[in-house]
Amino acid sequence: MNLNSIFGQFSPDYFLLMPMTLASMLMAISWLFFSNSTNWLPTRIGFSFLTFNQTIIKTIFQQTNPSSITWVPIITTVFILLFSVNVLGLLPYAFTATSHISLTYSIGIPIWMSVNILGFYLSFNSRLSHLVPQGTPSFLLPLMVIIETLSLFAQPIALGLRLAANLTAGHLLIYLMSTAIWVLMNNVAIASITLIIFILLFLLEIGVACIQAYVFTALIHFYLVQNL
């Protein structure tokens, strides 16, 4: 694809002799196997997805209370969405939407606001008491209220910024490493060592993509437990 051409986005892209359009279509069609089936027993793919979903729920909701059970579908959906976008963004010529704060804030801020509004609605006095830590001297009360209020409003900012910053840093490292491999192609020894480092870095970024999706949803669950 010619990145300097306006119509370059319509030209077919190839990765390891495989058309990227075909790979994207196969990946999209694969989600059909995760839809509800009319069979009495689930298929192997459906059972695998069900096991994966149950593992996510057990991992995120290790310490919870019965009041947060209704939030399980929402938080699980957010995790699967972030996990899919993060991992698919590592494909060549793929756009990683979660590396932009416009998307991460669009997901994090509404959920954070709804969780805190619910907390103030259910127990207004209890939520106000969190602004003043127990044992605070009287002369520090106004200052602690300001600090705790600022830290409360910093939660959604850090929530979205952490995800976008980690993915952006990882993509920059992959880009710089791949550029170094291309420049050092004439020197086989150095290029081979750089390629090995690049493969290890790519595997690390796959882990980062999974971990960041977990951290995002785990923090949402933590904020939820604080407000219930």
Swiss-Prot record:
SUPFAM superfamilies: F1F0 ATP synthase subunit A. The chain crosses the membrane at residues 14-34, 71-91, 101-121, 139-159, 165-185, 188-208. GO terms for cellular component: mitochondrial inner membrane; proton-transporting ATP synthase complex. It is a multi-pass membrane protein. It is found in: Mitochondrion inner membrane. Coiled coil: none annotated. GO terms for molecular function: proton-transporting ATP synthase activity, rotational mechanism. Keywords: ATP synthesis, CF(0), Hydrogen ion transport, Ion transport, Membrane, Mitochondrion, Mitochondrion inner membrane, Transmembrane, Transmembrane helix, Transport. Gene3D superfamilies: ATP synthase, F0 complex, subunit A. Belongs to the ATPase A chain family. F-type ATPases have 2 components, CF(1) - the catalytic core - and CF(0) - the membrane proton channel. CF(1) has five subunits: alpha(3), beta(3), gamma(1), delta(1), epsilon(1). CF(0) has three main subunits: a, b and c. Mitochondrial membrane ATP synthase (F(1)F(0) ATP synthase or Complex V) produces ATP from ADP in the presence of a proton gradient across the membrane which is generated by electron transport complexes of the respiratory chain. F-type ATPases consist of two structural domains, F(1) - containing the extramembraneous catalytic core and F(0) - containing the membrane proton channel, linked together by a central stalk and a peripheral stalk. During catalysis, ATP synthesis in the catalytic domain of F(1) is coupled via a rotary mechanism of the central stalk subunits to proton translocation. This is ATP synthase subunit a. It comes from Pisaster ochraceus (Ochre sea star). The gene is ATP6.
